[in-house]
Amino acid sequence: MGFGSCSRHALFTPAAFSGSFTTMTTSCFKRVYTAQIHGGDALGKRLPSVSSFSGQLPRHGLHRQSLAFFSTSHRRQTSPPPSPRTTSQSPTVPSKASTTPPTSLNTSKPIATESQDKTDWSIIVKLAGNIWPKNNPNVKFRVIGALTLLVAGKVLNVQVPFFFKTIVDSLNVPITESTTVWVLAGASIAGYGAARILTTLFGELRNAVFASVAQNAIRKVARETFEHLLNMDMKFHLERQTGGLTRAIDRGTKGISFILSSIVFHVIPTALEISMVCGILSWKFGWDFAAVTAITMLLYTWFTIKTTAWRTTFRKQANAADNKGATVAVDSLINYEAVKSFNNEKYEVAQYDTTLKAYEKASVKIATSLAALNSGQNFIFSSALTMMMLLGAQGIVKGTMTVGDLVLVNQLVFQLSLPLNFLGTVYRELRQSLIDMDVMFNLQSLNSAIKDTPTAKPLHLKGGEIEFRNVAFAYHPERPIFRDLSFKIPAGQKVAIVGPSGCGKSTVFRLLFRFYDSNSGQILIDGQDIKTVTLDSLRRSIGVVPQDTPLFHADILHNIRYGNLEATDEQVYEAARKAHVEGTIQRLPEKYATKVGERGLMISGGEKQRLAVARVLLKDPPVLFFDEATSALDVYTETELMRNINSILTGQGKTSVFIAHRLRTISDADLIIVLQDGYVAEQGTHEQLLAMPGGVYHRLWQAQLTESTQPTDEEIERQREELEVVDEKKKQ
């Protein structure tokens, strides 16, 4: 689900409706099902929208158990059909650089516990701060206005049965030829109509007044959560599925909407109406009527809560199967090419169907248990109405009550049936919303392992000298990457870091950029420990072209401008020319307005890398880091691009670090650092390292030399001219 939909979640309020309804189809292949509303909880039933009711209701939020799937990189495990496969797991990071562990999402405990009640209360207190902000009188005014309209609407709603009673008593007289309706009951009929109209009007005004309060609270909490997630360290994001995080935010914000709407539009009005009805019955007809009403409400509430708690077990099973099905479907579709490459369509369908079967089984239990809930609720309420009718009939026989009084009692009690019908749904959804909000607020409470110290100061660059001093680091405690790494990158020079795969070349950048912190040792820039400077100033001073180029699902212009959001179009075009991607862009039908697709999958790997180079050139930081920045380019484009980058670096005196497997791209570096087994094995210029027979660099160079030979400038120019001639002939 798109994250932006959170703010459009509808508010709910009780309204009269009956008949069947069908749930809206939601994201991640949620099933469509139907249920009958008779007076109790319904499968997936929620209160209708305040603005309109079209017969379709959104599904409820999912239980805490269903959120557990996103706590780690998750893949389903079911009995596979003929083609078994292995699954990969996301790497974890050592405890030294760990993030505060997430709150447990275990759901084996009962729904309502003492600790959970305390948590629920703390959530409500947090939410109250968003709907009653200290420095926003406009929001407070709207809350007061909504509550005033609520009370006025309920008072008028209770008057409707009184007008009905008056009409009945007025017509319960001998009728003559001169008798007219307006003479007997005209005023009462007019009052009856006015009361009903004003009740509805006040209800709609209440919804309109309170809507901005609820949506403002949703927006504020969602923005704060999203901002907090962006400030978390890399370990946190590597350990969680992005889809799971967005679903947690979405459910949490929907939970805010439901809690606000249920409290303002259901809980408070129902409690107020029950109190008023009991008071009226006791005042006008005696304590026995009020006692029957109070006992009925208590028994009805107790039965509904107990039965709903029992049914929640089945709902948890359905939610778990639903989440698993969503994970299977999304995982399969994202890896569409792999599915097709290995002809595993039937396997994926079988995996998905297994979750559908589990969902079907749980849904049948939900539907059948609904009958018990509806039957019990109907029995309790019908018994109460029968007792009321008996007491009323006795009053009429004794002469203490009129027929209109009997109608009044019936109408007063019957008006309570509608909000009580939703009691099961409100209770279940209220508990679920609190759980969903707890998950979201727990995300806000997590602390990032990488953050500014209280005394952090902005980085003061003097030239861009970088020094690693006795650095030790490991992603996994049992597999250290660096043991005692020490080297120095001179300011304003081009330095290359090379070595065998897995020696930690890319880790150098991750530590320098503070995606992770070293376990021990120091990393210095111009003599300043990077742990003592602000993250913002540090990361603004470093530009990186990563090995796996991250692109947004937007146009090319935006993806380049992302390096400097304040850059003009002309500056973007100039950066594209420097990155040798301008010609490619101009050949596209929509040029700079061309969408690159999700993760840039609609363009080639080489084009993605050149866009990344253009982006970092537009950022223009004093320190540049190229992590296999040209690995997807052909030899000719790579050579020209590197020549252009070198000219830029030479003219501006920037410190640049190149990580490369193709050694010919960094043979002109001022310094080459060779890593192996967590140490600096060798360092020097290209010529110095080649003069060390048997050295690591010498062996790597010889191995690559047998595969290809670096072309000269004349060969590059000649072959490019030949390609241009071929292209011209094709155009003709």
Swiss-Prot record:
Q: Where is the composition biased (Polar residues)?
A: 96-114
User: What's a Gene Ontology MF term here?
Assistant: ABC-type transporter activity
What's the source species' lineage? Eukaryota, Fungi, Dikarya, Basidiomycota, Agaricomycotina
Tell me what organism the protein belongs to: Cryptococcus neoformans var. grubii serotype A (strain H99 / ATCC 208821 / CBS 10515 / FGSC 9487) (Filobasidiella neoformans var. grubii)
What spans does the record annotate as topological domain Mitochondrial matrix, numbered to this chain?
56-143, 203-262, 306-378, 427-732
Assembly: Homodimer.
What is the name attached to this protein's record?
Iron-sulfur clusters transporter ATM1, mitochondrial
Induction of its expression: Expression is positively regulated by CUF1 during copper stress.
Q: Where in the cell is it found?
A: Mitochondrion inner membrane
> What role is this protein assigned?
Performs an essential function in the generation of cytoplasmic iron-sulfur proteins by mediating the ATP-dependent export of mitochondrial Fe/S cluster precursors synthesized by NFS1 and other mitochondrial proteins. Hydrolyzes ATP. Binds glutathione and may function by transporting a glutathione-conjugated iron-sulfur compound. Plays a role during copper stress, in a manner dependent on the copper metalloregulatory transcription factor CUF1.
Please name the gene that encodes this protein.
ATM1
